[in-house]
Amino acid sequence: MKTPVASLVASLALAAASTSASGFRAAPVADYKADELSFGFSAGTTFVGGEAREHVFHPKGNLADYLEEFPGAPAKDRRHQLSRLDWDMAAAMLGVSGSVRYDRLSLNLGVWYGGSGSDDYDMKDYDWMEGDHVPYSEYSRSDTELTDAWLFDINVSCDLWRSDGFTGYVFAGAREQRWKWTCDGRNDYWYTENGHVWDHNDEHICDYRQVLFFGYVGLGGSWRLTDALSLSAYASWAPGWKGRDRDNHIGAGKIVNDSFDYDANVYAAGVSLDWHVAERATVSFGLDWQKATLNQGDLRQVEFESGEAEAMPDGAGMENEYLAFTIGLDYAF
């Protein structure tokens, strides 16, 4: 998978930095007040860099039929990969979040939206259509733009430990992410038989979207380093994620819809350096990482003209990983 660091560096060129929330999540930014209500608000910009992957597998079935169709595949492998599409995740996103706290409990809610604003990114398509070629039998690269990116996050946190200079807490919540790409112009082809072919056009080839939803639990802490600086960190885990994707193959004349049940995992971690510029205002610099591991689901393909549909149980796969850099302003009142 393309390193999230490389994509993050590319996404930082999309826009000038402005204010943002304390990281790419809904964080407990309201001040602690014993037996009292308090509120916090965050707003700003997040730069995301990473990669999303779309997989197509040979469906499970009769092993003899499978090996007859793909004689080069290992006999032990009944989930031979037919195709994999790697989509660049590079976006500048505006986000707002709020926090309502009573004593040690805090309810946190946030939303982010953005896109890449440019088609200077890649979709790489790898195919293994004739058994197990190393590294592939066919390859193409296309110009791609991440046109829409949404993130919704809600969680409840509870302080377990409070002392001078340190707060430790646990949290549980739910998150939904939506990513949509458009692909215009296919630039490079490579075939086993024909070698490299260069082709450039501005045709609208396909659209792709991923939607993920998951519940998660985690641990976090905040350390007061000096009167002006604090350091915050967290880690979270989701035991399963549910999702769907849709690949509108305009050039090929078909739509592919995939669905995924609660399976695979989501891991996340982050760190934030907070600069207390005033009694109630904080400028924060956050770095967040998230990885949704490979989930296998069902594929349904529909031809545009004939309307003919084909179902492939366990024929689809989806995953993604990103880094997000945030600069922002938090205000507690």
Regions found by a protein language model. Name each.
Residues M1-A6:
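Positively charged n-region of N-terminal signal peptides that target proteins for export
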Residues T19-S42:
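Outer-membrane beta-barrel biogenesis signature
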Residues F39-G49, V100, L109-G115, C158, ...:
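Transmembrane beta-barrel strands of outer-membrane/channel proteins
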Residues G50-A91, Y113-L151, Q177-L212, A238-G270, ...:
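Extracellular/periplasm-exposed beta-strand and loop segments of Gram-negative cell-envelope proteins
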Residues G98-Y102, I154-L160, G221-W223, D227-L229, ...:
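Residue-level signature of outer-membrane beta-barrel architecture
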Residues R104-L109, S163-F166, A228-L231, W275, ...:
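Repeated loop/turn-to-beta-strand initiation elements of outer-membrane beta-barrel proteins
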